[in-house]
Amino acid sequence: MKIFLICILALSTAFGNLKAQTATLLNGAWEFNEGEKLHHLFFQDGFYFHTVQQGNQFIGTDGGHYEVKDKSIITKALFDSIDSTGVDNIKEIPFSVTSTQLSLSVPQGEANFQRVDNGQAELAGIWRITGRMQDGKITAIHQTGTRQTYKLLTGTKFQWVAIDPAKKQFSGTGGGSYTFKDGKYTENIEFFSRDNSRVGASLSFDGKLENGDWHHSGLSSKGAKIYEIWSRVGKAN
């Protein structure tokens, strides 16, 4: 009986480790070409963001929380720019993943994503804006109601979203690739929901990590001076 229990515990531990390894394999940025459409799929710290663009044209985005269960990804949407009734919906998506490819079994068929990065970087994670410099003083930002602004960063990709899950409301998003080196944070915009003409633009900021928070300052896309503080969001699962 003792040996049997030890075997069960060993199998349970091994299964738990395999699940964790699979979830870690999902982390990062993935891309899938569907004809002229490009799908971006980001997994980081229990959150997922999925965006579709065609050339410079933004098509749509959705995202929320996820977890791995057996051979499926279980998602719960926080936002959906195309169909707001999809918010709060739970989906179970069968998948397989290797170090370079992610295959998802979706109603339209098999979607084979190629890895862009593995989600490893100093800034990789989910962030929410918590402070802003005003009149020379840093003022805490307390987002009212259920409005939320998130920024997800993988190893090389970023995306921000402005949403209100309680109202199933989507206000905007933008994303692309980024670099963070020698105190300089640079974004290269690849999609932007509010203005396609922003695609191809680059924005550079002075950036630093201080007490776990991310400080960055410079000029916004509209040319206004900004100094923002972003704080990490705890893992969703």
Model-derived features with residue positions:
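Lipid interaction determinants
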Residues: 15-173, 184-237
